[in-house]
A protein has these predicted regions:
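Membrane-proximal cytoplasmic C-terminal regulatory module of class A 7TM GPCRs
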Residues: 394-413
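Alpha-helical transmembrane segments of multi-pass integral membrane proteins
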Residues: 287-392
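Solvent-exposed interhelical
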Residues: 148-169, 242-264
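Juxtamembrane membrane-water interface segments that cap and precede transmembrane helices
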Residues: 62-76, 206-222, 284-288
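Kinked, hydrophobic transmembrane alpha-helices enriched for aromatic residues
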Residues: 24-52, 85-93, 123-131, 268-276, ...
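Specific transmembrane alpha-helix
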Residues: 84-99, 139-151, 228-251, 298-318
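Long hydrophobic alpha-helical segments that form multi-pass transmembrane helix bundles
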Residues: 166-245
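N-terminal signal-anchor module of multipass membrane proteins
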Residues: 2-90, 94-97
């Protein structure tokens, strides 16, 4: 379908502009995504704060069966799966905002300015989070890429998909060529050892001052790193934007074929790269190729999981849109998803206290299974906070501040 370049969402000329009900799947996906991010970050980064060895997958302690099982599970469903969900949902959010501005009659330059302010503020929040709490922040990169996406809101869908596909293909071809070259030079075993170094020992944490110093170092390095990250993140964000523009998640029954295709491709990519990557991490597959491919090709699992959720909960969305209450088991996840920024930053506060060598300094020598439980426990705390805020009818404090700084006291007009 071709679109008017200035229209974020195609609407029949004879129909009034509808006010769509709030979608449950994006919030549900955000809530689940935060669990994946918590578990992945504990293994790859937070354990370094306690003085432990970092790893992309976690370590096997005393030949533990549970550690091995955890590594096999997380390489397929956790590591390099949370951030692509985040990327897709952030692009989806840009699409929803663009549609809202169009319905309000904003001219294109003004709409771009509103989106640029919103994601510029997200980048500032990310920079502060990176320096003062966690150098592994992702909001800075997403905010800066969001600024670029503000320029693309009027681009035709076909062009956006072409851009996304081309960037994704180039990224994977370069990654594959690079890893094959490294494997030829280093050998599979040495390459896997290099990959499993995770965040490495470059960012030692001995005091809170070292947290600040490391954050500043990474922030300065982001000047060069974020353009490279954009090759991996932007295709997923563009896909999310198109999903919003086309109303795919808003009407899953109409778009069932697209959702099924996305879910199928995503699951094949996640398992097809994640399972071999797990075998590599356990030393059962003497290569390092899949440890890279799971972070490039395997990211298709992110939008795939979102599509799967849309298919599974299509009936629930229809009933909620008709006025039915959200089912009780889904409410905590949705409450957290609506407050994802607060939940994400709160994770950092919790894990800094738990892992920081200048604080509790726990779990430095923990295996993959125990770190999975620790990450889950930290996520559960954020879930409880979100439920309490929902019960009180309060937004997340960071969401409220972000909205105020982005749109002003009166909000969007």
């Amino acid at each position: 379908m071709e679109h008017q370049p200035h229209r974020p969402i195609p609407l029949p000329a004879s129909s009034p502009v509808p006010r769509a009900p709030r979608l449950i799947v994006p919030d549900l996906a955000r809530g689940l995504m935060l669990w994946g991010i918590a578990v992945a970050n504990v293994t790859t980064a937070w354990v370094v704060f306690a003085g432990g060895p970092a790893s992309l997958t976690g370590w096997v302690v005393d030949d533990s069966f549970w550690d091995k099982l955890t590594i096999m599970f997380t390489t397929s469903f956790v590591h390099a799966r949370g951030f692509p969900m985040f990327s897709t949902l952030l692009g989806f959010g840009v699409g929803l905002i663009a549609a809202s501005l169009y319905r309000r009659g904003y001219p294109l330059p003004k709409a771009r300015g509103v989106i640029a302010r919103r994601y510029g503020m997200l980048a500032i929040f990310g920079a502060l989070h990176m320096v003062f709490l966690f150098w592994g922040d992702i909001m800075l990169a997403y905010g800066l890429i969001g600024l670029f996406m503000a320029c693309l809101i009027a681009v035709r869908t076909r062009v956006l998909l072409w851009m996304a596909g081309s960037l994704f293909a180039v990224t994977n071809l370069v990654a594959l060529a690079g890893v094959l070259l490294l494997e030829a030079v280093l050998g599979g075993g040495q390459l896997q050892e290099l990959l499993n170094g995770g965040s490495g020992d470059l960012l030692q944490v001995t005091s809170y001052w070292s947290v600040l110093l490391n954050g500043l170092i990474v922030l300065l390095g982001s000047i060069f790193g974020i353009p490279l990250q954009a090759f991996m993140l932007l295709p997923l964000m563009l896909l999310g934007f198109v999903l919003a523009r086309e109303g795919v998640l808003a009407d899953p029954a109409r778009h069932r074929r697209v959702l099924a295709w996305l879910a199928g491709v995503g699951l094949v990519a996640a398992l097809g790269t994640g399972v071999p990557a797990g075998l590599e991490a356990l030393g059962l597959l003497p290569t390092g190729v899949f440890g890279v491919l799971t972070m490039t090709l395997g990211v298709l699992g992110g939008p795939g999981f979102i599509a799967l959720l849309a298919l599974v909960f299509a009936g629930v969305q229809e009933r909620v849109a008709a006025g039915a209450p959200v089912p009780a088991p889904l409410r905590p996840l949705i409450a957290l998803g609506k407050r994802s920024m607060t939940g994400y930053v709160l994770q950092s506060v919790i894990f800094l206290a738990v892992f920081g060598s200048f604080a509790l300094g726990l779990f430095a020598d923990a295996g993959a299974a125990l770190l999975l439980l620790v990450g889950t426990a930290g996520w559960l705390v954020t879930l409880l906070v979100a439920v309490a805020l929902e019960a009180a009818g309060k937004p997340g404090p960071l969401e409220a501040l972000h909205r105020r700084l982005s749109y002003g006291k009166g909000g969007l007009i």
